[in-house]
């Protein structure tokens, strides 16, 4: 068995800039770059891809999430899913993006930043064809996340 002694690359500002120019950042790193979570520099950047070659592929710095029908025209700016779109992505792709782990952070932060007004999220959900009940479920449990 070969063991590499080469140091794994760190998530740097330059790497994030490169990824934002070439991919769409989603999931945990979208919550970080939107200001709703603290960075974990050991966690790979999560990007969406419609290339089946990258299905379930992860290297030291990038985790590729294969979503062939991902709508790249709604809520994406400069390679980053915006706040509302990140919430919508967690609702549409909970398993792929780890919604159970990361959704509480963005819900709590978004709630504070927008004084409990989720109307922009509901508008984007309608545009993406997401049922209102999916967000309503998370909102019903929002107090549990805030109290933790």
Where in the sequence are the language-model features?
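Hydrophobic alpha-helical interaction segments
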Residues: 69-148
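Short gly/ser-rich loop at a beta-strand->alpha-helix junction or flexible surface loop bordering the NTP-binding
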Residues: 1-74
């Amino acid at each position: 068995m070969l063991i590499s002694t080469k140091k794994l690359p760190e998530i740097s500002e330059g790497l994030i800039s490169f990824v934002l120019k070439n991919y769409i950042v989603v999931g945990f790193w979208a919550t970080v770059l939107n200001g709703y979570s603290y960075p974990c520099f050991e966690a790979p950047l999560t990007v969406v891809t419609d290339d089946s070659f990258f299905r379930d592929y992860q290297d030291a710095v990038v985790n590729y999430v294969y979503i062939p029908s991902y709508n790249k025209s709604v809520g994406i700016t400069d390679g980053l899913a915006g706040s509302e779109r990140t919430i919508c992505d967690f609702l549409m792709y909970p398993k792929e993006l780890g919604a159970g782990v990361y959704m509480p952070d963005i819900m709590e932060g978004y709630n504070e930043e927008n004084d409990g007004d989720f109307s922009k999220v509901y508008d984007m959900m309608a545009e993406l064809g997401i049922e209102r009940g999916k967000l309503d479920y998370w909102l019903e449990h929002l107090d549990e996340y805030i109290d933790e």
